[in-house]
């Protein structure tokens, strides 16, 4: 048998090296993703806890207020970061953060109306919307795997939502709207990263969204908080930052094909949280729909990884 072609050999070595690197950093990815999964769960429970005393605008104001304070503290500790905060592409920042705030509002509100596992399962439709939006806005082509991922995603959504049946709840549309908004936010983030650093994107996200939250808040809303609510306020503030921090470091430590399967553990974990803390039933339709959505995402990820 003849020797493999140079192109095939290079591709084989590239894939082999990626597998070795992925295995080498698997422990680190697992550690960061554990932090991210715990942060997402704490965020969901904290929003539900605060919703007993505050409206969604006020909850988001706490989250973004904590973010602004933490990022300003970093600027004080590292003065060289100030240069990165120079206003640049502010119209795109404004578009991104307006859509992101609306998405956060819809997501947080859905947490107070639906079982936690249902919200988290439908949130995984975001990659479907990203694939659709990437064609007109980023010029990316539609591949067979992306098309298959989109079709499987919509089938999974139909299994979870079950339109036309008695189990259908309008609040389910809130989660789908939030997932679509997060996809728009991700597309605009990719456009921003061409000229704007990550720290600046995070800073302007919190700085712009804080007044949006305050606009719908009672000026004295913090006085509504009783001692029983304080752990939830701290949870929203910390989890809002730690979730993004851990997720970013997980993707930095390993390939998406390694990180994303860990992220899928969000659904059984949050289902367990909902069952333990709120007595929420484990809905087989939610798990079946989530499995279909996830299979489409995994198919596309594997195809993209092999073709890279």
Question: In which residue ranges do the predicted regions lie?
Answer:
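Transmembrane alpha-helical segments that form core, pore/gating elements
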Residues: 45-48, 56-57, 71, 166-225, ...
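Glycine-/small-residue-enriched transmembrane alpha-helix faces in small-molecule transporters
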Residues: 4-58, 167-191, 308
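Helix-helix packing/entry segments at the starts of transmembrane helices
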Residues: 119-125, 192-207, 244-275
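C-terminal-most transmembrane helix of multi-pass membrane proteins
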Residues: 4, 8, 268-308
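Hydrophobic transmembrane alpha-helices of multi-pass small-molecule transport proteins
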Residues: 145-162, 182, 285-304
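Loop-to-transmembrane-helix transition segments
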Residues: 28-36, 81-106, 169-178, 217, ...
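Transmembrane alpha-helices of multi-pass small-molecule transport proteins
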Residues: 54-102, 181-184, 204-220
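C-terminal transmembrane-helix exit sites in multi-pass transporters
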Residues: 109, 126-148, 268-287
């Amino acid at each position: 048998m003849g020797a493999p072609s140079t192109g095939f050999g290079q591709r084989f070595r590239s894939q082999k090296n990626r597998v070795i690197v992925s295995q080498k950093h698997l422990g680190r990815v697992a550690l960061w993703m554990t932090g991210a999964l715990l942060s997402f769960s704490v965020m969901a429970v904290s929003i539900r806890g605060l919703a007993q005393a505050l409206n969604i605008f006020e909850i988001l104001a706490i989250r973004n207020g904590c973010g602004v304070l933490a990022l300003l503290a970093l600027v004080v500790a590292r003065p060289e970061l100030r240069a990165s905060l120079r206003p640049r592409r502010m119209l795109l920042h404004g578009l991104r953060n307006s859509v992101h705030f609306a998405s956060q509002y819809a997501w947080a509100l859905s947490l107070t109306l639906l079982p936690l596992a249902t919200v988290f399962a439908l949130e995984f439709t975001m990659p479907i919307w990203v694939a659709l939006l990437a064609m007109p806005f980023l010029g990316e082509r539609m591949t067979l795997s992306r098309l298959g991922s989109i079709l499987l995603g919509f089938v999974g959504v139909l299994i979870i939502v079950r339109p036309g049946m008695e189990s259908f709840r309008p609040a389910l549309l809130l989660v789908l709207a939030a997932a679509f908004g997060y996809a728009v936010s991700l597309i605009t983030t990719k456009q921003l990263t061409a000229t704007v650093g990550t720290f600046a994107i995070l800073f302007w996200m919190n700085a712009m969204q804080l007044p949006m939250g305050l606009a719908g808040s009672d000026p004295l809303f913090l006085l509504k908080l009783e001692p029983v609510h304080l752990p939830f306020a701290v949870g929203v503030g910390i989890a809002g930052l730690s979730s993004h921090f851990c997720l970013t470091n997980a993707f930095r430590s390993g390939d998406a094909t390694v990180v994303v399967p860990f992220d899928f553990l969000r659904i059984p974990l949050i289902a367990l949280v909902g069952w333990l803390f709120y007595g929420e039933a484990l809905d087989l339709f939610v798990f079946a729909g989530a499995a279909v959505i996830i299979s489409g995402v995994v198919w596309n990820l594997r195809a993209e990884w092999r073709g890279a």
